[in-house]
C-alpha cells in the first residue's frame, strides 16, 4: 500500500499536549534509545512528540469525522481518514503532521542503520491501510484523532515515525488524561489510544511488531467488540473497560462497524475537547522526534529486554496467578475502571503481558518519569491498541465498508483494544522489544502504568525490570543485530529472523493490502458483526505472540514471559495473542529476527494484510509460545495457567478463546497464503540464490501442478499445489515447516510438533468452541468477521508466516484462516465463505501479494549478506526428495500433509460449524487442554522435551477427539497416496515395501500407530491449503505427535531453515474436514509410497496401496474387493503380511471381514495366507482381530491350521489374558465341531495352558468334553472306514445267534458311520439276518433280542426307533408270510413295548419296502387276530387312525377289500362279545364311510348295523342304539323299522323324549308312520292300533302342534279334534283283545302327556274303529305350556 500522505497541520499537537510533551522531553535524555542516557533523551523527545500529538488531537476529531464520511478505497479511505479530517482541522495540525514526517524520516534514517530497522521500516509501509482504518476509528475522539495523526505520520514517514507516533500517542493519552480528556477517556481516550496506537502500530508493526501489530490491531477491534465476551481478554477487558462503558462502542463494532464507527467518531469528536486537535497537531509535529526517541528507546529496550523479561516474567506469573484467582468479571470490571481512571496502569499491564522488553523499557521509563509513565502508559495502550487496531484496521481495511466507516467505530475499537490489548501489547512489546524499540520504551512506560493497574505489586516488578532495563535493552539490540540463530541441537548457525530465506516469502508490500481487502467484503462484514470477536482475536493474537516471544526468549526471559503470559492470560489472553506478534519478532534473535523481518515484510507488503496476518499469526504464534513457554515453564506458566484456569474458568475460557482466535487468524492467513505461495512460487523463491532451492522449487511445482491437475478439488488446492513445489523443497528436509505455498504458517520447528500437538489438540476443540465462546461472550458471534479479517491478514502474513524456533507452536495462518472462515460461516458475516469464493479471494490476494514481491526481494537482498550458507545445511537446502529421507524431511512432509487436511476441512467447513455451539464450559476445558498443549509445545523447544510433549499432545489430541483424528488420518493417507501417484512420484519414490514403511514411519510413524499421530496427519498445512474455503475455526489443529527424534529433527530444521520455501507448517488438523485438504496436499506434503500392488481401476489406490490408507470422507473408489476379486484380496493380504505393519494388518482384517461376510471363499482362496495373516496379527498382539477372523472363517467353513490354534492358546497363556479365555474356548469348541482333529497330547497341552492362565473349571470342562466328542467321532470314522468288517461281524453274530452282540454292533456302526446310505445298507443286512437268513424253527425271535439291546443304549434316539420299526416291519411280513402268527405277535408286542409307531414306516427289504400303510396295518391286525388278540387288532387299527386309502397313504383295491373283510371279522367277534361300542367303532371305519374315494356300496353293511342295532336295543344300550340309528340314517344305511320303533318306544319309556321325538320324526320322514289327515272343518288323526303308547302320544303331539293355530283361534271353539284308532289293514282278523289293548294304550298316551289330555269316546265308525275326540280345553292348556319347544321339534326339520 502506498504510504499515507503526511498528517495535515490539523494533526499538530495541541498546546496542552505540547506542554506535556515538552515536559516529557525534558524528563528524557536524548540517548534513551541506546542506553540510560539516550533513553532519557528519547523519553523527552517522546514527550515532546506526545505534546504535539495532543495539540493535534482536536483536529484529529474533525478529521475522524470527515474520514468516516469519505472513504472510497482502502488507501484513499485511509488517506482521507487521516488527511481529510485532519486537513479540515487547523493548519497547526498540518504543521504537526509535517513535523511528524520529519521525525519519521529521521527515525527511518536511524532504522536503516540497522537491518532490523530496515525490515521494520519496510513492514511499516504495508500496514498503512490498517493504520488508516484504525485512524478512522480513533478519529472518533480527540485522542483517536491524535492517534490517527501519529499513525498517519508513521505510515508515511515509516517505522520511526510510527514509533514516534506511539510516543505521541502516549503523550496524547497523557494529554487526554487531562480533565477534559478524562471526561471522554472511556471512549475518546481509548479511541485515541487505539487510533494512535493503531497508526503507530500500523507503522510500527512493519518494523517492530509488523506481524503482531497488524494482528493486534485487528485483534484490538475484535477486542473492542468482544472485550466483554472474551474470557481470555479479562485483563485486557478490564483495561478495556472503556469499550464496556457506554461510550465504548467498540463492543458492537463488529455488528455495525461502519455505523458504530461513524457514531463513535461523532460522539468522540463531540466528547473530545477542542484542545485535542491542537494537541494532535503538536503531537504530529513532535511525532518525528518521538519516533526517533522511540527507535532509540526500542534499542535500549532491546538491550535490556532480556533482564526485564526475566523480571517481567516472574512478576507476570505472579500477576497471572493473582488475576486467575480474581473473578473474570470482577477483574474485567476492575480493569475497566483502572483503564478509565488509570490508562497508564492498564497500559502497563498490557505491555507487561505484551512485551517483556517493552515492559522493561517502560519500567525504566517509569523510573525516569512517573508522569511520563502515565503518559506513556496511554501511549503504550495506544500502541497496543494500535497493534490490535492495526490488525483490526487491517481487517477493516480488508472490509471495504470498514475502510470508509471505520473512523468512529474503529476509534472505539481502538480504545477498547487499547485497554484490552494493553496487557497484550505490553507482553507483545516485550517480546517484540527488538523491533519495537520505541514501543518498548513506550510500553515500558505503559508497563509502569500497567503495574499500577495490575494491582500486583507491579512497582516491585517494574523495579526489578528497571534494574535490568538497560541490560535487557542491550540484549534486545544484540538480538536485533544478531544475524545468526544458535541451535544447540544441531550446532548450526542460525539465520536472522529477517533473513531472506525466511522473509522474502513473508514480506509483502502495501500491494498485498488489496489482497487482504479481497477478504475485506467478508472481513469487513465480519468486522462489523464480530468486532468484539476481533477484539478477542486480537487478545488471542496477543496471547499467541506472547507465547511466541516467550518461547523465543531465553529461559529466563521465557520464565518472565510465562509469568507475564499468565498475567496477560488471566487479564487478557487475547491481548497476549496480539502481543505474540511482537514477541515473536523480539524474543530470540533467530526467531525474533525472522518473525520481525517477516512481520516487517508483511507490513510492507500490506499493512492490512500483514497486520491481519500478523495478528492471526500472532494468535497462533502467541498461543504457541504460551503453550510452548508454558510447557517450558511448566512450573511457572503451566501452574499459573492452571491456576488461572481453575480460579477463573471464564478467564481460562477467554484464554482458550483467544488461542482459538489466534488459530482462526492463522486460518485467515492461510486463506491468503495461496496467493503468497503463488508469488513465492512464481518468482520470489526463484530470486533466492540458495543452492538447490530453485531445483527443488521447480520439482515441487511440477508435483504440485500434477497433483492440482489430477485432483482438481478447488482453486485453493491449486494454489496450495503451487506452493507445494516449495513445500516439497522444504519437505526434502528443509525443515521450514512454514511454506509459502498455500498457507505459509508460523511454525516453530523444534516446538512445532509438540506445541502443535497441544495447541492443536486444544485448538481442535477450542477452535470450534471458540466461536461459541465468542458467541456467548459477544452476542454477535463476531469471530467470523474477526477471522475473515485475519484471513486478510494471512494473505500477507501468510507469506510472512513466522517460525519461532523455540516456540512450540508452529503458526499456520492457513489453519487459522480456515478457522476464521469457519467463524465467518457461522457468523454468516463473511458471505463469500464458500470454497470457490475463498479461492477467488485467495487468487486475488495472491495476485496482490505478488505485487508486494519487490519487498520480499528487497528483504532478500538485505538479508542475503547475513546468511551463512552452509552447503550441507539441510535446513536451508533440504535433502533431495528421492534420495534422503531424514526425520526432518519426514517432519516436513508431515507438516505439509496438514495442508491437505486443511483442504479437507475447508471442504467440510459446514460440518465444522456445529462446534461453534459449544458451551463456555467446553471452552474452559479446552483452555485447560491448551495449557497442557502449550506446556508440551514449550517442551518441544528442546528435543527431549519435544518427545515428552509429543506424548502430552497425544493425550490432548485424544481428549479432543480421537475419532476425528482417525478419520482425518485415514483420509489424509489415502489422498496422499493418490497425490503421489498423480504427481508421478510413484517411480521416483517407489521403494521396497520395507523402505517405504520406514519412510512412512519417519514421516508419520505416530500417525499410523496412535490416534495422536492421526491428529498429526491433519496438519495446518492442509488447513492452510483449505484456508480459502470458509472452513471455520472448527478446523482444529491437533498436536503433531512425532517421536522424540523426529521432534528434535523438526526443531533443528526449523531453526536452521526458517525461510519460506513453500513448506507447510507442521500444525495438523483434527477434524475430518482437514483430511480432505490433507489428502489433496499430499503431493505437496508427505508423499505416500506405493506398496506396489496391481489393483483394478475401480479400487482406491490409497486404501489398498498405501501405508496410511484412504482418508476421504466419501471415497468414490472401492474399499472392499467385489465378488470375483478374491485374487485381489489374496494379493493385498500377502503384501500387507510381507510389510508386516500394524496399520496394514488391521486394514487386512477389515478387508477380510468385509469381503467374506458377503462372499464365500472361492478358488483363489489360500489357506496359507490366512494362517500367515493370523500369525502376523498374533505377533502384533492383535488378539481381537484374530478372534474376528477365526470366527468368520468358521462361519464360511474355513479352518485355520492346528498350529495357529495352539499359538493362540500360547499367546493367551503367555500374556496372561484371562479375559480372552471364554472367547478362545468358544472358538476352540466351534473348531472341534467344525471338524478340526486334535491329538490327545494337544488336548493335554491346551488344558495345561488353560491352567496357567487360571481358566475357570467350566472352561476347562468344556475343552474336556470336546475331547470326548472328538474321540467318539474318531471311533465313528473307524467304523466308517471298516464297514466290511462290521458286515463280517454281523454274519458271525448270525451264525452264533448272538443277537445281543448284533445290537451292539449296530450301535457302533451307527456312531461311526457318517453316510446315511452306508448306514441303511448295514441296517438292511441286519433285517435280512433277522428274518430271511434265520430259518431256524423255535420260539426265539431274533428281532426282539436285537431291539432290546438297541433300546437300552443311553444315546438312543429317533433314528434307532425308526431303524427298529423298519426292521420290525420286515420281520412282520416275514412271519406273516410264513403264517408264524406267534412270532409275528412277539414282534408286534416288542414294537408296542418300545412304543415304536411302525404303522407309519416301511420295511427295509423286500416287498415291504413298497407296502402301503393299509397293507402294513392289515398284516399287523391279522397277526393279532390270528394270534387271538382282538384288542391288539383294534390297537393297530387305532394306531393307524383307521386309515385305508388317502392321498397321503394310497393303497390298492386289494388292500381295501382286505380291510373290509378284516373289519367285518373284527365286528362279528366284537358283537359276539357284546362290545357294542367297539363294534360300532369298527363298523364306522368300514371302507366307504371315510372318504369319497372309496367306491364301496355301504348298503351292504345294513345287516351288520341292524344286527348291531337290534343287539343294542335288546341289551338296552339305548345310547349306542341311538348312535347307530342316527349313523345309519345319516349314511343312508337301510334300517329296519321294527328296530327303529322299538328304539323310539324304549327311549320314550326311558323318558328320553328328545331322542324319542328325534327318531320318531326321522321314522316319520322315512315312512314308518302314516301322514296326518284332515280338512278345514274337521281334524282327524289316524293312529294305527299296533303303535305303542309312546308312539301314540308323539302322534297326538304332532297333531296338536300342526293344528295349533286353528285350535287357539277364538272362533274355533266348536271345532272337534277326532282320533281314529285304526285297525290293521293287513290283519283284518285282528283279535279284539289286541285292539282293546290298543284302546288302553291310547288312553294311557293321553294320560302320559304333560299336562294330561282328555279324550272322549264319540262313536265307532263303519270299520268298527273307535273314534275319540280331544277335549278342547285340555288341548289349549297343553299348547299353552308346550308350544315353544313342541313347535321347534315338530314344525322344523333337524337338518
Swiss-Prot record:
Q: Where is the composition biased (Basic residues)?
A: 43-52
**What subcellular compartments does it reside in?**
Cytoplasm, Cytosol
Which intervals carry biased composition (Basic and acidic residues)?
59-68, 92-113, 459-474
Q: Which UniProt keywords apply?
A: Cytoplasm, Differentiation, Spermatogenesis
The record's annotation in InterPro entries points to: TOPAZ1 (IPR038952), TOPAZ1_dom (IPR029435)
Does the UniProt entry include the keyword Transit peptide?
Answer: no
Q: Can you name this protein?
A: Protein TOPAZ1
Q: Which GO terms describe its biological process?
A: cell differentiation; spermatocyte division
Residues annotated as region Disordered? 1-128, 441-474, 725-753
Q: Does the keyword Cytoplasm apply?
A: yes
> What residue spans carry the Polar residues bias annotation?
735-753
* The protein's role, per its UniProt record: Important for normal spermatogenesis and male fertility. Specifically required for progression to the post-meiotic stages of spermatocyte development. Seems to be necessary for normal expression levels of a number of testis-expressed gene transcripts, although its role in this process is unclear.
Q: Can you quote a single GO CC term? A: cytosol
Amino acid at each position: 500500500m502506498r504510504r499515507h500522505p503526511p498528517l495535515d497541520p490539523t494533526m499538530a499537537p495541541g498546546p496542552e499536549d505540547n506542554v506535556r510533551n515538552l515536559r516529557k522531553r525534558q524528563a528524557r535524555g536524548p540517548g534513551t534509545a541506546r542506553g540510560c542516557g539516550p533513553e532519557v533523551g528519547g523519553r523527552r523527545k517522546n514527550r515532546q512528540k506526545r505534546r504535539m500529538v495532543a495539540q493535534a488531537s482536536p483536529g484529529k476529531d474533525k478529521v475522524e469525522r470527515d474520514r468516516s464520511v469519505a472513504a472510497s478505497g482502502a488507501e484513499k479511505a485511509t488517506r482521507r481518514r487521516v488527511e481529510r479530517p485532519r486537513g479540515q482541522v487547523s493548519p497547526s495540525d498540518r504543521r504537526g503532521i509535517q513535523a511528524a514526517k520529519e521525525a519519521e524520516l529521521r527515525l527511518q534514517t536511524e532504522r536503516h542503520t540497522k537491518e532490523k530497522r530496515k525490515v521494520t521500516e519496510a513492514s511499516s509501509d504495508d500496514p498503512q491501510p490498517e493504520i488508516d482504518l484504525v485512524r478512522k476509528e480513533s478519529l472518533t475522539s480527540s485522542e483517536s484523532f491524535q492517534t490517527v495523526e501519529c499513525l498517519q505520520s508513521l505510515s508515511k514517514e515509516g517505522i520511526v515515525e510510527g514509533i514516534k507516533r506511539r510516543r505521541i500517542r502516549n503523550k496524547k493519552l497523557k494529554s487526554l488524561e487531562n480533565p477534559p480528556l478524562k471526561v471522554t477517556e472511556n471512549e475518546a481516550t481509548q479511541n485515541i489510544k487505539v487510533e494512535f496506537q493503531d497508526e503507530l502500530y500500523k507503522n510500527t508493526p512493519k518494523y517492530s511488531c509488523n506481524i503482531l501489530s497488524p494482528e493486534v490491531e485487528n485483534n484490538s477491534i475484535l477486542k473492542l467488540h468482544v472485550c466483554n465476551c472474551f474470557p481470555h481478554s479479562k485483563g485486557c477487558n478490564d483495561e478495556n473497560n472503556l469499550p464496556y462503558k457506554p461510550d465504548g462502542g467498540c463492543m458492537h463494532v463488529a455488528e455495525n462497524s461502519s455505523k458504530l464507527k461513524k457514531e463513535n467518531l461523532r460522539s468522540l469528536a463531540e466528547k473530545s475537547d477542542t484542545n485535542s486537535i491542537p494537541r494532535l497537531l503538536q503531537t504530529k509535529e513532535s511525532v518525528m522526534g518521538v519516533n526517533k526517541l522511540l527507535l532509540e528507546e526500542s534499542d535500549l529496550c532491546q538491550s535490556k529486554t532480556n533482564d526485564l523479561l526475566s523480571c517481567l516474567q516472574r512478576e507476570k506469573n505472579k500477576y497471572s496467578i493473582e488475576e486467575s484467582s480474581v473473578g473474570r468479571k470482577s477483574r474485567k470490571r476492575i480493569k475497566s475502571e483502572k483503564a478509565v481512571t488509570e490508562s497508564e496502569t492498564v497500559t502497563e499491564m498490557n505491555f507487561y503481558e505484551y512485551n517483556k522488553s517493552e515492559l522493561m523499557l517502560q519500567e525504566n521509563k517509569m523510573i525516569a518519569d512517573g508522569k511520563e509513565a502515565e503518559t506513556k502508559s496511554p501511549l503504550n495502550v495506544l500502541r497496543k491498541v494500535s497493534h490490535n487496531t492495526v490488525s483490526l484496521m487491517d481487517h477493516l481495511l480488508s472490509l471495504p465498508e470498514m475502510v470508509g466507516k471505520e473512523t468512529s467505530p474503529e476509534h472505539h475499537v481502538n480504545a477498547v483494544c487499547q485497554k484490552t490489548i494493553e496487557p497484550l501489547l505490553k507482553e507483545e512489546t516485550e517480546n517484540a522489544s527488538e523491533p519495537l524499540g520505541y514501543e518498548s520504551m513506550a510500553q515500558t512506560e505503559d508497563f509502569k502504568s500497567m503495574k499500577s493497574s495490575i494491582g500486583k505489586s507491579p512497582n516491585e516488578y517494574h523495579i526489578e525490570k528497571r534494574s535490568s532495563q538497560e541490560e535487557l535493552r542491550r540484549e534486545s539490540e544484540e538480538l536485533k543485530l544478531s544475524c545468526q540463530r544458535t541451535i544447540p541441537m544441531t550446532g548450526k548457525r542460525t539465520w536472522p529472523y529477517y533473513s531472506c530465506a525466511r522473509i522474502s516469502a513473508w514480506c509483502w508490500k502495501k500491494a498485498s493490502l488489496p489482497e487482504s481487502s479481497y477478504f475485506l467484503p467478508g472481513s469487513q462484514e465480519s468486522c462489523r458483526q464480530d468486532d468484539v470477536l476481533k477484539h478477542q482475536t486480537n487478545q488471542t493474537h496477543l496471547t499467541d505472540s506472547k507465547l511466541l516471544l516467550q518461547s523465543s526468549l531465553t529461559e529466563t526471559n521465557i520464565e518472565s514471559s510465562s509469568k507475564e503470559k499468565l498475567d496477560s492470560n488471566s487479564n487478557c489472553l487475547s491481548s497476549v495473542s496480539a502481543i505474540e506478534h511482537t514477541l515473536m519478532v523480539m524474543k530470540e534473535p533467530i526467531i525474533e529476527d525472522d518473525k520481525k523481518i517477516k512481520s516487517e515484510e508483511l507490513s510492507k507488503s500490506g499493512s492490512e494484510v500483514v497486520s491481519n496476518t500478523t495478528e492471526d499469526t500472532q494468535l497462533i504464534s502467541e498461543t504457541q509460545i504460551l503453550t510452548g513457554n508454558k510447557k517450558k515453564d511448566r512450573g511457572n506458566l503451566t501452574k499459573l495457567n492452571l491456576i488461572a484456569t481453575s480460579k477463573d474458568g471464564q478467564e481460562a475460557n477467554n484464554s482458550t478463546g483467544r488461542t482459538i482466535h489466534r488459530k482462526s487468524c492463522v486460518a485467515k492467513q492461510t486463506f491468503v497464503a495461496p496467493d503468497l505461495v503463488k508469488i513465492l512460487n512464481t518468482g520470489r523463491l526463484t530470486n533466492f540464490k540458495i543452492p538447490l532451492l530453485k531445483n527443488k522449487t521447480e520439482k515441487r511445482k511440477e508435483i504440485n501442478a500434477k497433483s492440482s491437475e489430477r485432483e482438481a478439488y478447488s482453486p485453493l488446492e491449486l494454489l496450495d499445489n503451487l506452493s507445494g513445489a516449495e513445500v516439497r523443497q522444504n519437505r526434502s528436509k528443509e525443515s521450514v515447516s512454514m511454506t509459502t505455498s498455500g498457507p505459509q504458517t508460523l511454525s516453530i520447528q523444534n516446538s512445532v510438533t509438540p506445541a502443535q500437538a497441544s495447541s492443536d489438540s486444544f485448538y481442535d476443540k477450542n477452535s470450534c468452541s471458540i466461536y461459541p465462546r465468542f458467541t456467548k461472550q459477544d452476542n454477535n458471534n463476531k469471530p467470523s468477521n474477526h477471522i475473515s479479517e485475519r484471513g486478510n491478514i494471512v494473505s500477507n502474513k501468510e507469506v510472512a508466516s513466522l517460525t519461532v524456533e523455540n516456540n512450540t507452536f508452529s503458526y499456520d495462518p492457513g489453519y487459522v484462516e480456515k478457522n476464521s472462515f469457519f467463524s465467518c460461516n457461522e457468523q454468516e458475516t463473511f458471505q463469500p465463505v464458500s470454497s470457490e469464493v475463498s479461492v477467488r479471494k485467495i487468487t486475488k490476494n495472491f495476485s496482490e501479494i505478488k505485487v508486494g514481491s519487490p519487498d520480499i526481494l528487497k528483504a532478500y537482498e538485505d538479508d542475503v549478506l547475513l546468511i551463512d550458507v552452509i552447503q550441507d545445511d539441510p535446513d536451508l537446502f533440504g535433502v533431495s526428495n528421492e534420495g534422503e529421507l531424514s526425520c526432518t524431511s519426514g517432519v516436513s512432509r508431515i507438516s505439509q500433509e496438514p495442508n491437505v487436511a486443511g483442504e479437507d476441512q475447508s471442504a467440510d467447513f459446514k460440518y465444522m460449524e456445529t462446534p461453534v455451539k459449544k458451551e463456555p464450559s467446553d471452552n474452559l476445558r479446552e483452555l485447560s487442554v491448551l495449557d497442557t498443549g502449550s506446556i508440551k509445545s514449550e517442551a518441544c523447544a528442546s528435543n527431549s522435551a519435544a518427545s515428552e510433549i509429543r506424548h502430552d499432545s497425544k493425550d490432548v489430541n485424544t481428549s479432543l477427539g480421537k475419532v476425528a483424528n482417525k478419520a482425518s488420518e485415514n483420509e489424509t493417507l489415502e489422498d496422499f497416496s493418490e497425490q503421489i501417484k498423480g504427481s508421478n512420484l510413484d517411480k521416483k519414490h517407489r521403494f521396497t515395501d520395507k523402505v517405504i514403511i520406514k519412510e512412512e514411519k519417519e514421516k508419520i510413524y505416530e500417525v499410523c500407530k496412535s490416534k495422536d499421530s492421526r491428529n498429526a496427519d491433519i496438519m495446518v498445512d492442509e488447513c492452510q491449503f483449505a484456508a480459502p474455503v470458509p472452513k471455520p475455526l472448527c478446523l482444529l489443529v491437533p498436536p503433531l505427535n512425532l517421536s522424540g527424534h523426529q521432534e528434535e529433527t523438526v526443531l533443528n530444521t526449523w531453526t536452521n531453515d526458517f525461510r519460506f520455501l513453500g513448506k507447510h507448517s507442521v500444525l495438523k488438523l483434527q477434524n475430518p474436514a482437514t483430511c480432505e485438504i490433507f489428502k489433496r496436499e499430499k503431493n505437496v506434503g508427505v508423499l505416500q509410497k506405493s506398496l506396489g500392488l496391481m489393483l483394478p481401476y475401480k479400487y482406491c489406490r490409497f486404501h489398498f496401496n498405501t501405508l496410511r490408507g484412504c482418508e476421504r470422507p466419501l471415497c468414490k473408489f472401492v474399499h472392499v474387493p467385489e465378488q470375483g476379486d478374491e485374487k485381489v484380496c489374496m494379493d493385498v493380504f500377502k503384501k500387507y503380511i510381507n510389510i508386516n505393519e500394524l496399520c496394514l494388518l488391521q486394514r487386512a482384517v477389515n478387508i477380510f471381514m468385509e469381503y467374506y461376510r458377503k462372499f464365500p471363499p472361492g478358488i483363489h482362496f489360500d489357506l496359507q495366507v490366512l494362517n500367515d495373516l493370523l500369525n502376523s496379527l498374533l505377533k502384533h498382539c492383535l488378539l481381537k482381530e484374530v478372534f474376528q477372523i477365526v470366527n468368520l472363517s468358521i462361519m464360511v467353513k474355513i479352518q485355520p491350521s492346528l498350529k495357529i490354534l495352539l499359538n493362540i492358546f500360547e499367546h493367551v497363556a503367555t500374556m496372561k489374558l484371562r479375559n480372552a479365555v471364554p472367547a478362545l474356548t468358544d472358538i476352540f469348541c466351534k473348531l472341534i465341531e467344525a471338524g478340526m482333529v486334535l491329538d490327545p497330547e494337544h488336548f493335554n497341552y491346551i488344558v495345561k495352558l488353560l491352567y496357567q492362565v487360571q481358566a475357570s473349571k467350566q472352561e476347562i470342562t468344556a475343552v474336556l468334553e470336546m475331547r470326548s466328542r472328538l474321540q467318539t467321532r474318531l471311533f465313528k470314522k473307524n467304523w466308517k472306514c471298516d464297514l466290511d468288517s462290521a458286515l463280517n461281524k454281523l454274519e458271525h453274530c448270525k451264525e452264533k445267534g448272538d443277537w445281543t452282540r448284533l445290537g451292539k454292533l449296530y450301535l457302533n456302526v451307527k456312531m461311526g458311520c457318517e453316510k446315511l446310505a452306508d448306514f441303511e445298507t448295514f441296517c438292511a443286512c441286519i433285517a435280512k439276518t433277522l428274518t430271511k437268513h434265520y430259518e431256524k424253527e423255535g420260539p426265539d425271535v431274533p428281532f426282539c433280542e436285537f431291539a432290546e439291546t438297541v433300546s437300552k443304549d443311553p444315546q438312543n434316539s429317533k433314528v434307532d426307533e425308526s431303524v427298529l420299526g423298519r426292521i420290525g416291519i420286515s420281520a412282520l411280513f416275514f412271519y406273516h408270510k410264513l403264517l408264524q402268527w406267534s412270532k409275528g405277535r412277539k414282534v408286534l408286542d416288542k414294537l408296542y413295548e418300545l412304543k415304536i409307531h411302525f404303522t407309519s414306516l416301511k420295511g427295509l427289504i423286500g416287498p415291504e419296502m413298497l407296502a402301503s400303510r393299509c397293507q402294513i396295518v392289515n398284516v399287523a391286525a391279522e397277526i393279532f387276530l390270528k394270534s387271538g388278540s382282538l384288542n391288539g387288532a383294534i390297537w393297530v387299527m387305532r394306531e393307524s387312525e383307521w386309515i385305508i386309502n388317502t392321498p397321503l397313504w394310497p393303497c390298492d383295491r386289494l388292500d381295501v377289500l382286505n380291510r373290509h373283510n378284516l373289519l367285518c371279522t373284527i365286528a362279528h367277534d366284537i358283537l359276539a362279545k357284546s362290545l357294542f361300542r367297539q363294534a360300532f367303532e369298527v363298523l364306522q371305519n368300514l371302507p366307504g364311510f371315510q372318504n369319497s374315494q372309496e367306491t364301496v356300496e355301504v348298503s351292504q353293511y345294513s345287516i351288520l348295523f341292524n344286527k348291531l342295532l337290534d343287539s343294542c336295543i335288546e341289551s338296552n344300550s339305548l345310547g349306542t342304539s341311538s348312535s347307530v340309528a342316527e349313523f345309519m340314517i345319516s349314511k343312508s344305511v337301510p334300517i329296519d323299522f321294527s328296530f327303529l320303533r322299538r328304539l323310539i318306544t324304549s327311549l320314550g319309556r326311558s323318558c328320553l323324549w328328545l331322542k324319542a321325538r328325534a327318531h320318531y320324526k326321522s321314522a316319520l320322514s322315512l315312512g314308518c308312520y302314516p301322514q296326518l289327515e284332515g280338512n278345514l272343518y274337521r281334524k282327524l288323526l289316524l293312529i294305527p292300533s299296533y303303535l305303542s303308547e309312546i308312539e301314540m302320544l308323539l302322534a297326538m303331539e304332532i297333531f296338536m302342534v300342526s293344528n295349533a293355530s286353528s285350535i287357539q283361534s277364538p272362533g274355533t271353539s266348536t271345532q272337534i279334534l277326532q282320533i281314529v284308532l285304526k285297525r290293521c289293514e293287513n290283519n283284518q282278523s285282528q283279535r279284539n283283545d289286541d285292539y282293546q289293548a290298543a284302546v288302553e294304550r291310547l288312553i294311557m298316551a293321553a294320560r302320559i302327556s304333560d299336562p294330561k289330555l282328555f279324550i272322549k269316546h264319540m262313536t265307532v265308525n263303519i270299520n268298527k274303529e273307535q273314534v275319540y275326540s280331544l277335549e278342547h280345553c285340555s288341548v289349549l292348556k297343553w299348547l299353552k305350556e308346550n308350544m315353544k319347544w313342541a313347535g321347534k321339534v315338530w314344525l322344523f326339520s333337524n337338518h
